[in-house]
Amino acid sequence: MTDRNHHRAPVPVGDVVPGDPPVPITVWPVPAPHEGETMSNAMGVRLVHNLAHPSDLIIDLAEGPQLARAIIAAHRRSHLQTARPAGWGRESATLIVTGWPVPDASPVDFFLRCRAHLAPGGCVAVLLAHGDVGLPVDVVIAAKRAGLAYLQHIVAADRPPRRGQQAQLAIHTDVLILTRSAIKSGSGDG
């Protein structure tokens, strides 16, 4: 049976996630990462297939082998399994994937380095484990100070929420997708 009563979508009011313009939110149903790892295998596959083409370079700064497996299976090129202080190579990457927080760098310095290694149109994917609800805002502010724009917010939900259950924060990972800002915003307090 087909419902012949068509209902209009509600008119959006305000900005769910602060951004200029508003940032789209996407939900990916993927398994949760194992303890001490940044992502599940399914998350690695989604990131690689959605954010990179076969000839693109991907910089893998994530904990665990999941992204590397996805890169190999998809015949993509990768560079750097850990954040080495010596350098990230000379070639620009289309995708940089990292967990958060990053060791041995201030957030703004880390994002300045990411921006310097991004190819035009490239993205930085920052995976945030559930927990601190203010953390995504802090990450976006640091990225903006480094000249990166907040492009998309992905909610990686490992199970559907249940009515009346207060554990909504413990069922997902936030993935913030950042890209080079068209507007120059130096590393000042802006």
Give the positions of each predicted feature.
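Class I S-adenosyl-L-methionine-dependent methyltransferase catalytic core
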Residues: 1-190
